[in-house]
Amino acid sequence: MCIRDRVKYLSVNDLGNRVWQIANQQASGDRDSTTLLSTVALGGDYARVRTHAKLVGQGGSTRQVALYFADGSQTHDFRTTQEHVAPKTTSDLLFKGAVNDVASSVYTGLIKIGPDARGTQAFQTNRNLTLSDGAWAKSVPNLEIDTNDVKCSHASTVGPIDEDQRFYLESRGIQPDVAERLVVLGFFDEVLEQLPVGSLAGELRELIGKKLHKAVIPGVLGVPA
């Protein structure tokens, strides 16, 4: 990328359940450039996505966002790098996923701050929902910092859906299975709002709803009755 460039990239995986995917996304940002690397991963048997955002010019910024949902025996594997070479650069990452049945997900992330990257800010967040006893998710955030005067943080969670949220919906007459779908969609909304999808947001919500119970209830998940 050149000075002050603005780039938005979106990858959507809705592959068949017998397909393997090995994907690699790379971006290098120059001075005052801005990049958005975004991923939606719903399909495939095994899907691995490696994303590397490198900031080589002062004032550059990058953001990585992803939404993933694995069911059946699917495996989703994400490996991300936020590399800061130049000073006063900024990166932010938000990955949110859900696993159901006996599916699995693995997230491995690295924030790498070089010796000349003073004044850098870098943040990394990975949240995972486990929707069944047989599903599992693993989150491995990492920091590698070679200079002072930086602000960096990482956070990760793995666990079931919030029972208080489900109870609240059920107390208002919503059926348990529908309440679970709404909680999961609400969990994903933070990512959906940041994706450069425009009018496709409704279609993505429909795909997620179908994966929850293989059918969407009209009028409930943003799908017309």
What are these regions (language model features)?
Residues R4-I174, F188, L195-L221, A225:
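Conserved beta-strand/loop scaffold segments within soluble protein domains that form the structured core
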